[in-house]
């Protein structure tokens, strides 16, 4: 190496370790429209100032490392570094802070949720200077959103495909989730669809096990779909779970579903991964398939209040990666979901523009620039007595999914489906007539049960069933 080269490489470089906040804490920074903005809940280790903790998050999730390196001089850190531009204490929590970080758009590959998360929620979550770290929200700039296809079809196109308007869609997860033969599984699908449901569903862990191989299941479910359509005159569907051990196998299953004429397939997007999910979403758009998304594994990531990632971030990522439905909690059922927080990310899934609203956990205004919306799916421990609340909470653009609440009917699967359809139609009619579903819900169901023996039987079975536990996910 020549002396001249040595001089150039060493200009401005001083080996050693320096505080992150000297480079990455920039409270004077004015965010750009093209920045990805993140709100982190930071719990520093004792003795670590919040500014240093916030700067460490910005550094370790962008250009920084634990020591000064001479190759910093070969690029422009001011152009590429993440910046912690704000710190605020969390009300009611000791030693917790919201750190706001801005990332230049050039740090991220176009159209890749995988790359975005690898940076923002990568190694930094194991950083020793932090006791805990949670990503509460992201603002995705419109310039980045435009690099994503998003949902294969979206809410309006799905309604047009199904020719169903003015009410929530009804679904059912086939139970028991594991152990049925393909023929008996298909029989249950047929009975539920014939009884009045729009969709039935594979459970998240129904893939291709020894008791029921995927191809057999697809064939019997397709038979059930077409038979129930012929009898009812309505378009029906079954979420055929294409999730598999490899992307190649997943695509093979999706292709077979299309060849059978199935209208919709399904993917477990967190266990399957964002790369696989985006690939499947692209195939579904190109081939006219709807895509149902299950969020299995989400609670491992989002349930702890001070560490991990809030589901609203996973919901935004899914809208970018692609899916026409996603499970979003119920508020009233057996699974976690506080009302205002749930409605916050439901709006982020469906609406084109969502204003900042800290009372619902929304830290940033989000403009989706006409990216198609996603139908939220309410599923888990719900039954006919929940129908008024679900209709009032989620509105028409949703899927209400009753597994045990259909298949647990004392008269069988088809009467269980009838009970749910009657309850839904009664609630929609009452709402359209101006009645208050929140206040008059039980009375509306009781009135409908007088002329529907199937609904009356369901009301009797589940009149005492409640899931009253305190929500973990609060503001």
Curated annotation (Swiss-Prot):
Keywords: Acetylation, Calvin cycle, Carbon dioxide fixation, Chloroplast, Disulfide bond, Lyase, Magnesium, Metal-binding, Methylation, Monooxygenase, Oxidoreductase, Photorespiration, Photosynthesis, Plastid. The modification N-acetylproline is found at residue 3. GO terms for biological process: photorespiration; reductive pentose-phosphate cycle. One of its GO terms (molecular function) is monooxygenase activity. InterPro entries: RuBisCO, RuBisCo_large_chain_AS, RuBisCO_lsu_C, RuBisCO_lsu_C_sf, RuBisCO_lsu_fd_N, RuBisCO_lsu_N_sf, RuBisCO_lsuI. The active site is at 175 (proton acceptor), 294 (proton acceptor). One of its GO terms (cellular component) is chloroplast. Residues 1-2 form a propeptide. It catalyses: 2 (2R)-3-phosphoglycerate + 2 H(+) = D-ribulose 1,5-bisphosphate + CO2 + H2O; D-ribulose 1,5-bisphosphate + O2 = 2-phosphoglycolate + (2R)-3-phosphoglycerate + 2 H(+). CDD domains: RuBisCO_large_I. It is an enzyme of class 4 (lyase). Substrate binds at residues 123, 173, 177, 295, 327, 379. Coiled coil: none annotated. Its EC number is 4.1.1.39. SUPFAM superfamilies: RuBisCo, C-terminal domain, RuBisCO, large subunit, small (N-terminal) domain. It holds the Pfam family RuBisCO_large_N. Mg(2+) binds at residues 201, 203-204. Binds 1 Mg(2+) ion per subunit. The record marks 334 as: Transition state stabilizer. The modification N6,N6,N6-trimethyllysine is found at residue 14. Its cofactor is Mg(2+). Belongs to the RuBisCO large chain family. Type I subfamily. RuBisCO catalyzes two reactions: the carboxylation of D-ribulose 1,5-bisphosphate, the primary event in carbon dioxide fixation, as well as the oxidative fragmentation of the pentose substrate in the photorespiration process. Both reactions occur simultaneously and in competition at the same active site. This is Ribulose bisphosphate carboxylase large chain. It comes from Cucumis sativus (Cucumber). The gene is rbcL.
